[in-house]
Amino acid sequence: AALPELHVFGRVTPEDKLRIARLMQARGDVVAMTGDAVNDAAALKQADIGVAMGSGSEVTKQAAKMILTDDRFGTLVTAIKLGRSIYDKIVSYVRYQMSSLFSLVLLFLVASIFGINDGVPLTPLMVLFLSFFITVFPVIVIMSDPAPSDIMTQPPRDPAVTLANPRSVLQWLLYGVVLFAVILAALLLAPDEPSTTVATAATSMAFVVAGLGSIIGGLAMRRDPLSGFAAPIVGALGWLSIPVVLTVVSVEVGFMQDLFMTQGLTGPQWMLCLALSAVLPVVIEGDKAIRRRSAR
């Protein structure tokens, strides 16, 4: 009964270690146990994360999931911080990629069902450009984002909750549907009809919104539930300026227009594209703000 209030155990035996690990696991805790002697192997095997000392016995090392090569307990804190940061980045990366994938799948599915531009809302080269040249930079931003200052005060994640849990899938779908909707809106609100043979403002605007929406959306999705627009942000903006320039060049420069079958846009058309591109990050930040408030 006193286990939650106890923080230090003295003169414990290997049997005590095993019992403590089982009791804490029964409470739903994630347990890490350290040891160096042969008789510590049972407790290390029982724990969720068995940590053997680098100077410990070979039997203990075999039973452990991790070996503390420098025998310094402070290294465990560094390892936990790094592990949490890596996991958060993986979650953010999957969220970003799945949202982008859902948006394109929905776009082509709806275009095929309703006969929008013969089922080809974006040219194949546009899709390849978005997938391999535009989205790579938001991914770099996600992977290079520093760990939040409070990462070590957060409770351990539930190991039973997978990456593709129902809540995450709904989040991917929500963000993907929003991005799909604004791309489709750009296609339908353009002053002309899309075409599969000549450059039009419709396909050009849809291409711009798909690119800018993915870029700004990636900035917002780099952290969760913290705001993606909070500092530090200068490095992220530097990386994201590259795909922004590439998107503008693809629409406004002559030889790129011939390559991607795009045409230059007017000022009002650019303003509409920017407004539509801002919808996804607004939805993302609103979703995160609601979850932060409900968690208080």
Residue ranges and their predicted role:
Residues 1-32, 47, 54-226:
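Membrane-embedded transport module
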Residues 124-128, 200-203, 259-277:
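Structural signal for the N-terminal portions of transmembrane helices
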Residues 182-186, 244-258:
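Hydrophobic alpha-helical transmembrane segments in multi-pass integral membrane proteins
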Residues 191-197, 255-263:
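Membrane-interface helix termini and inter-helical loops of multi-pass transporters
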Residues 214-218, 280-289:
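Alpha-helical transmembrane segments
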Residues 223, 286-296:
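Membrane-interface capping segments at transmembrane-helix boundaries
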Residues 229-238:
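Cytoplasmic-side transmembrane-helix entry/capping segments in multi-pass membrane proteins
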